[in-house]
């Protein structure tokens, strides 16, 4: 089933660092000032003159001229930490974060104890998603000044970005005034509370978004966070709260339909979307979500028809093609899917996602040679595309190139920060190898499944594989733990319910076994 998600609203990422840098550069207070006004400059000192002129340009908002003058000052006095800091700040305000970072680092080599420079170096590194380096600099700063509020705020944001939700919640909650200043930080704290099971605190912080200067957009961000965290009632409440204030009622209704879709209230979602279409608001996004609702209700023909309309309405939107391809594969309409694949690659010759879809169709058609070519092309177009790497490994394994498939997945585990999917895939390749008599393969497969769960406990397939292994060894009680988890994560998996039936039967729990067998029979149809 296609799961439609709205791209996260990131207002602070867009402008927050520039505002911080401006305050840093022009604040009169000694604790937060990035540079001291050069009032005692000697008239004949060319470097000081360029620096002073650069500062005047910066204060006037002319960042291009400020940049030019400060570069001249740094060229004449490369060992002057103040000039380096000033230039780094102007560069940050221009959103030249990589270059700004290098100048902050040069300044800190000269003066490692400059609190403000280190704080804003941390902000730069966070903005660049260089989280490990950002954390290191912020830890140094907090070691010297444990109560630095800006450093605590940034450390909380870095922790949330790296999924260290306990640290994020603790750190952000320690600076509530700063958190309240930006919707992004409120969202980060709420998301962290959700992840550590503090739902009431998460909701309380999301309610704070009503008081934001960003207005409706801040509340919409809160609704998105609640939706992502499966707190659907809170998401709906937040959306309803802006119904009379939001000028774009079409967008609001679409968001509400999206929440209801995620809550598996497909009929309600469909009703809202159909009303939008009836009112003339026909877009490919509305069509795609409506198609997902139809598919969830096993109305595949209706879904196909709606997606065909979406493609005709917006032929340059590859997402509609990809959704349609997914349905055709699921329905085993291989000929139609192959025809669509050719249309997609003609329309989107440089799309990695399109070549992943084409490769998946070719795998379904047992055309492993063409699948290898498609997935290789997808990897060339986007080397960090996890779906492309997994597809390539599957094509290699199906083509009898097991060793190459294992190498592909081992390399992906080493390269990608999100390892769990690759560990699961490699474990499944090894299980097939174990069936040929390679005894060590099953042991490593089990280790990989456990590692995958350690990295992401929501992987239903990994829980299923561990349950199946335990069941095969006669360990029904151990199998039951994993299989119940797998069924909770993926209730529509027929094979999981079949395995659960077997486990319950072996434990003498015949009534529960019968219920699972009934579910299996229903789902396999």
Model-derived features with residue positions:
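Helix-start (N-cap) detector for alpha-helical repeat units in TPR-like alpha-solenoids
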Residues: 47, 81-82, 115-116, 149-150, ...
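N-terminal leader/linker segments that initiate helical-solenoid repeat arrays
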Residues: 29-71, 75-76, 80-86, 93, ...
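Structural signature of tandem alpha-helical TPR/SEL1-like repeats
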Residues: 60-72, 93-106, 128-140, 162-174, ...
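Structural marker of alpha-solenoid helical repeat scaffolds
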Residues: 76, 110, 144, 177-178, ...
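Canonical tetratricopeptide repeat
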Residues: 86, 120, 154, 188, ...
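TPR/TPR-like (Sel1-like) alpha-helical repeat modules
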Residues: 488, 494-525
């Amino acid at each position: 089933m296609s799961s439609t998600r709205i791209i996260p609203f990131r207002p602070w990422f867009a402008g927050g660092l520039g505002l911080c840098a401006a305050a840093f550069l022009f604040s009169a207070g000694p604790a937060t000032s990035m540079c001291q006004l050069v009032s005692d400059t000697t008239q004949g000192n060319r470097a000081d003159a360029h620096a002073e002129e650069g500062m005047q340009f910066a204060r006037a908002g002319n960042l291009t001229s400020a940049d030019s003058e400060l570069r001249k000052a740094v060229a004449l006095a490369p060992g002057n930490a103040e000039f380096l800091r000033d230039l780094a700040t102007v560069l940050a305000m221009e959103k030249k974060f990589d270059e700004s970072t290098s100048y902050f680092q040069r300044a800190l080599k000269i003066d490692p104890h400059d609190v403000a420079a280190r704080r804003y170096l941390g902000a730069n590194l966070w903005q660049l998603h260089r989280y490990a380096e950002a954390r290191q600099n912020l830890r140094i700063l907090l070691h010297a000044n444990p109560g630095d509020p800006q450093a605590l705020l940034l450390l909380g944001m870095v922790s949330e970005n790296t999924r260290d939700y306990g640290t994020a919640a603790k750190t952000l909650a320690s600076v509530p005034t700063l958190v309240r200043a930006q919707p992004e930080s409120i969202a980060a704290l709420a998301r962290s509370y959700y992840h550590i099971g503090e739902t009431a605190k998460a909701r309380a912080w999301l309610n704070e978004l009503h008081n934001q200067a960003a207005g409706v957009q801040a509340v919409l961000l809160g609704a998105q966070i609640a939706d992502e965290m499966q707190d659907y009632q809170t998401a709906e409440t937040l959306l309803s709260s802006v119904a009379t204030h939001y000028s774009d009622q079409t967008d609001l209704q679409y968001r509400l339909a999206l929440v209801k879709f995620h809550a598996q209230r497909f009929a309600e979602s469909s009703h809202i979307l159909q009303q939008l279409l009836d009112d003339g608001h026909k877009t490919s996004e509305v069509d795609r979500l409506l198609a997902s609702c139809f598919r969830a209700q096993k109305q595949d023909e209706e879904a196909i028809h709606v997606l065909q309309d979406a493609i005709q309405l917006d032929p340059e939107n590859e997402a509609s093609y990809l959704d349609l391809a997914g349905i055709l594969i699921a329905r085993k309409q291989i000929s139609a899917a192959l025809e669509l694949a050719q249309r997609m690659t003609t329309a989107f010759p440089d799309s990695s996602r399109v070549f992943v879809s084409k490769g998946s169709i070719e795998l379904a058609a047992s055309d492993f040679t063409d699948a290898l070519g498609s997935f290789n092309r997808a990897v060339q177009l986007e080397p960090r595309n996890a779906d492309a790497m997994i597809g390539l490994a599957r094509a290699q394994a199906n083509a009898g190139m097991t060793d190459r498939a294992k190498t592909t997945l081992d390399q992906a585990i080493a390269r990608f920060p999100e390892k769990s999917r690759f560990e699961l895939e490699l474990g499944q390749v090894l299980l097939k190898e174990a069936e040929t008599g390679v005894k060590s393969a099953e042991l490593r497969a089990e280790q990989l499944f456990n590692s995958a769960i350690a990295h992401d406990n929501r992987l239903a397939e990994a829980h299923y594989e561990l349950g199946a292994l335990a069941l095969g060894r006669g360990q029904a009680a151990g199998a039951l733990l994993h299989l119940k988890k797998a069924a909770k994560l993926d209730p529509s998996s027929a094979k999981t319910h079949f395995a659960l039936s077997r486990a319950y039967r072996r434990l003498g729990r015949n009534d529960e076994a019968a219920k699972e067998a009934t579910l299996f029979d229903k789902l396999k149809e």
